[in-house]
Structure formats: structure tokens, C-alpha cells
UniProtKB/Swiss-Prot annotation:
Active site annotation, chain numbering: 10
Catalytic activity annotation: L-methionyl-[protein] + [thioredoxin]-disulfide + H2O = L-methionyl-(S)-S-oxide-[protein] + [thioredoxin]-dithiol; [thioredoxin]-disulfide + L-methionine + H2O = L-methionine (S)-S-oxide + [thioredoxin]-dithiol
Species per Swiss-Prot/TrEMBL record: Acidobacterium capsulatum (strain ATCC 51196 / DSM 11244 / BCRC 80197 / JCM 7670 / NBRC 15755 / NCIMB 13165 / 161)
Keywords noted in UniProt: Oxidoreductase
Record SUPFAM superfamilies: Peptide methionine sulfoxide reductase
A Gene Ontology BP annotation from the UniProt entry: protein modification process
Identification of the protein by name: Peptide methionine sulfoxide reductase MsrA
PANTHER family membership: PEPTIDE METHIONINE SULFOXIDE REDUCTASE, PEPTIDE METHIONINE SULFOXIDE REDUCTASE MSRA 2
HAMAP family according to UniProt: MsrA
């Protein structure tokens, strides 16, 4: 089993999308990259903690490669928007890859370089690639948020 952690705006739709991929064993919504221990949603929404809304993914690398997760990640959001996705704005909604190994760092950066060379997006990619920090699981009401409400997607 391996881990991947991505921030791509509001975590509700991101979580639901990654859950659908074969080889993904579990997805948890949470917060990462900030300076406050055990932050709450209310804390993170102040835009003062430095945390991003993220999903932490447990996946089987024999069934799905990290590159496939990256392809899904870049297809889920606009990685050229700085600190926002759609109507949501603030640093908590930044585009970020928290890598769990030097290999993930190398693969993620090479993936971004390839997307840039291919001109896949009309503006520069602003996705951060940073070492994984402490993942703080979000409150239970955020877990499987869309599923619990009978929704298939949100605005991402």
C-alpha cells in the first residue's frame, strides 16, 4: 500500500472522484501544510493557518500507478489558478502535491514539466510540489460528504 496526498480546491468533490478509481483503497479528507496542530475547518477557513484542504489516498501501486493519480488530479481542477478553484478562494484551496517519497517528487515534477511542454493549460501551472507534512483528518461530517448527501459531484 502507498499514499498520495493532493490539494485541488474543496476536498468534497476531490475525495468523491478519487474514490471511483480502481486501485484506490481509501480516501480521507483533511488538512495539511499549515502551522496549527489539529486544525478544524473553522480554523482553516480563516486563511491564517497555512493549511490546504487535501485528500490523503491509500492506493495499491500494483493496481494504479502514481502517474495515473496525477492524471486524475490534473483533470479534476485548474492547476493554473493561484489559491482558488472556481468560486472558492484562499490558500486552503491551493493546488498542491504533498509527496511521500523522493520518487513521488521526481514523478510529480516531471509530470508538470511534461504538461507545461505540451501546453496542456493556457496559463502557467502553479501547483506546489512539497514534502508531505502531518495530515490532519477533517471532521467526520466532511468524510464522504457528497455520498452522504446523495450528490454525485460538486462544482469542481
Amino acid at each position: 500500500m502507498a499514499k498520495a496526498t493532493f490539494g485541488a480546491g474543496c476536498f468534497w468533490g476531490v475525495e468523491a472522484s478519487f474514490r471511483q478509481l480502481h486501485g484506490v483503497q481509501d480516501v480521507a479528507a483533511g488538512y495539511e501544510g499549515g502551522k496549527l496542530d489539529n486544525p478544524t475547518y473553522r480554523d482553516v477557513c480563516t486563511d491564517l493557518t497555512g493549511h490546504a484542504e487535501v485528500v490523503e489516498i491509500d492506493f495499491n501501486p500494483d493496481e494504479i500507478r502514481f502517474e495515473q493519480l496525477l492524471e486524475a488530479f490534473f483533470g479534476l481542477h485548474d492547476p493554473t489558478q493561484l489559491n482558488r478553484q472556481g468560486p472558492d478562494w484562499g490558500t486552503q484551496y491551493r493546488s498542491v502535491i504533498f509527496y511521500h517519497s523522493p520518487e513521488q517528487q521526481t514523478v510529480a515534477q516531471a509530470f508538470i514539466d511534461r504538461l507545461t511542454a505540451e501546453k496542456r493549460f493556457p496559463r502557467p501551472i502553479v501547483t506546489q510540489v512539497v514534502p508531505a507534512a502531518t495530515f490532519w483528518r477533517a471532521e467526520e461530517y466532511h468524510q464522504r460528504y457528497l455520498e452522504k448527501r446523495g450528490l454525485a459531484t460538486c462544482h469542481i
